């Protein structure tokens, strides 16, 4: 457990009142959104599944915790098949394959580089996202 928590950058566990015996939840220590996500990612490491599905794993983190959660998510998905739902295009750009969906339908599929070069919907999304980051 300690190894899994360390691998997902959940260093806060050492500051809990009763260490790893601390009760978590409504009757115990309240986790903030980043801590809750780190704990969920540590649990994935403990289970060691072959396939991981993550839906907006960094959505609630805010800018301060996003980097830690992105690094932790990378650790969890390394050497596993992973389906990652992400609205942040910097996360999508790191994927082996990107599926672009509109109205519940896949409208484009390819690597980040292929999709940017294609000039379709992903290209428009990437240009708008990149402009907003400049």
For the regions a language model picked out, list residue spans one by one:
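The feature encodes the conserved inter-subdomain "coupling" segment
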Residues: 11-19, 23, 27, 125
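Short loop/turn and capping residues at structural boundaries
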Residues: 15-16, 35, 103, 126-127
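ABC-family ATPase nucleotide-binding domain "signature/switch" substructure
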Residues: 4, 21-119
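Conserved ABC ATPase "signature" region
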Residues: 1-15
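C-terminal boundary and immediately downstream tail of ABC-type ATPase nucleotide-binding domains
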Residues: 9-10, 117-134
């Amino acid at each position: 457990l300690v190894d899994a928590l360390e691998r997902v950058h959940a260093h806060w566990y050492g500051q809990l009142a009763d260490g790893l015996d601390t009760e978590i939840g409504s009757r115990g220590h309240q986790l903030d959104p980043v801590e809750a996500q780190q704990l969920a990612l540590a649990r994935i490491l403990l289970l060691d599944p072959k396939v991981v599905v993550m839906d907006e794993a960094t959505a609630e983190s805010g800018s301060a915790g996003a980097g830690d959660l992105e690094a932790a998510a990378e650790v969890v998905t390394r050497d596993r098949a992973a389906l990652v739902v992400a609205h942040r295009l910097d996360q999508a750009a790191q994927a082996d394959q990107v599926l672009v969906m509109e109205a519940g339908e896949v409208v484009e599929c390819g690597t980040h580089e292929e999709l940017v070069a294609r000039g379709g919907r992903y290209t428009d999304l990437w240009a708008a996202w990149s402009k907003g980051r400049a």
